[in-house]
Amino acid sequence: FLDYAKKIGADFMATGHYADLVFKKEKTYLRRSIDLNKDQTYFLHEVSSNEFKYCLFPLANLTKPEVREIAKSIQLPNRNKKDSVGICFVGERNMKDFLNRFIDFEPGPIIDDSNNIIGEHHGSLLYTIGQRQGLRIGGVKDMPDLPWYVFKKDQKNNSLYVCQGEDNPLLFSKGLSLERLHWITDEFSGQLECEVQVRHRHKAVKCILDVNELEVRFDEEIRAITPGQSAVFYLDNICLGGGIIADQIN
């Protein structure tokens, strides 16, 4: 999109992301927006500083309630629309039905933490770590009447692993490993003390990032670390960059 904006002669590209930019010593840094509840820098961690210098974020210093008041004052047609929690450009729709148009899902076994098969899933890609809903696991013989949660997925064998209890230790990780790492502005090496955020609107926790080994160790355990999602790093509300989670470290 930025290439197109340049092609038509635009000097800048404005987006509706809740994010901010800081300019220091001819460098461009990505910073959290003033509305920390809506901050979207997590989604922008793979954009480079060379691209950010052409971006404008008009919502950087506005909260969502303030944006709504502006929309009402100028009578925008969507001024009373509820907040969206769907994926951008996909919208509010049944995700399973949407994905079924592009992916053939195969059922597979649901396995408990004692390696017993206790059910069948509709396709392991449809489930996420920490998920409770949709497992369709009834009463299991000789097991307590507690809810089941996904704690691991084996994509190669199309298997789903579950445990009982929201606070089961199997759901928590002491760290994670990364597939790759992208820096937005400054590059780092060795070990870096910073904060890591593992999903949108999730509390960032202090950590030590080993840049050379692509490993992260948390100061406190984090629940439901999910391979394939992003781990994004911050220092004093500046988004340093991030990477794709390869695996949990327990």
Residue spans of the language-model regions?
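Nucleotide-activated chemistry modules centered on ATP-dependent adenylation/adenylyltransferase
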Residues: 2-239, 243-250
